[in-house]
């Protein structure tokens, strides 16, 4: 008799792809992951597909108002999705999957505007084209429903972090060091999960490295390690209302962009480039540490994901800043919890697609400030 595969415990169980291109805009991270009710997610494959400089330039240009935006945005979205499709095909090949084995692709898109205070957030994407190129269902536009419910639409990863990284009896913080830094506070016993954006991270570090090294990022923090933190400049950088704002809050390149940095540096033209890089590293560390001290002072363990997890100088700066803020927490990457740091964000959007398929909420209203928990996303059938 032919073998019968057991029915999934939950109708949404199965294999999903997650795609995430963040504020660093260097490329797209992808994962193929199996979700099964009652079990930890199982990653079947991962991939990274870089963006050509022409696409990066187009995406950076769209961060600020300009001429002919609709045409430029549409063309950039098509070019972006072409790279997403390459990532999906690589995941499919590596995992040895047929299209019919993939339940859906959860894709974030590329944020070009984030203005929740004005009632909108804009992630550049063309999910209909991605569905056509992959012949797989696509779930996208995760942030809009939260914004429609009065929330910030960000961060969305905390609900996933709580599912995967929470531990009874231990308060943990998960810190994503992407273009922007954000934290998720996971209470060990009782209390609400909280999370919010802290400030700039790789967005400004990469920008400064590109200007002065001609490279897309400061590899291993070596450029910063050659410099010394300039205390008056650090104070000037921290003199930004966002850092003092209470959560829920979210930010992005709308605020922390090259123009913001140049305006702050105007009074510090004598500071050497390597010292600026060291000071930007300290800015990231201090802005995170202050938020942890204020909202999770009892935290004993902080786990880092995102591109910053590969920067030992930044991690050391974070340890120092936490100590200075009176937080006695160990600092490690999420690899210590079994999830490589470069996979976490893409996994979160695969999980959001899984939640959408089961018509279950993907946000946490206590994190985003929305009127309630909502099912997030929109389906583009293959």
Swiss-Prot record:
Its EC number is 2.7.1.170. Pfam families: AnmK. One of its GO terms (molecular function) is ATP binding. Belongs to the anhydro-N-acetylmuramic acid kinase family. The keyword Repeat does not apply. InterPro entries: Anhydro_N_Ac-Mur_kinase, ATPase_NBD. SUPFAM superfamilies: Actin-like ATPase domain. It comes from the Bacteria. HAMAP family: AnhMurNAc_kinase. It catalyses: 1,6-anhydro-N-acetyl-beta-muramate + ATP + H2O = N-acetyl-D-muramate 6-phosphate + ADP + H(+). GO terms for biological process: 1,6-anhydro-N-acetyl-beta-muramic acid catabolic process; amino sugar metabolic process; peptidoglycan turnover. This is Anhydro-N-acetylmuramic acid kinase. Keywords: ATP-binding, Carbohydrate metabolism, Kinase, Nucleotide-binding, Transferase. Pathway: Amino-sugar metabolism; 1,6-anhydro-N-acetylmuramate degradation; Cell wall biogenesis; peptidoglycan recycling. CDD domains: ASKHA_NBD_ANMK. ATP binds at residues 22-29. It is an enzyme of class 2 (transferase). Catalyzes the specific phosphorylation of 1,6-anhydro-N-acetylmuramic acid (anhMurNAc) with the simultaneous cleavage of the 1,6-anhydro ring, generating MurNAc-6-P. Is required for the utilization of anhMurNAc either imported from the medium or derived from its own cell wall murein, and thus plays a role in cell wall recycling.
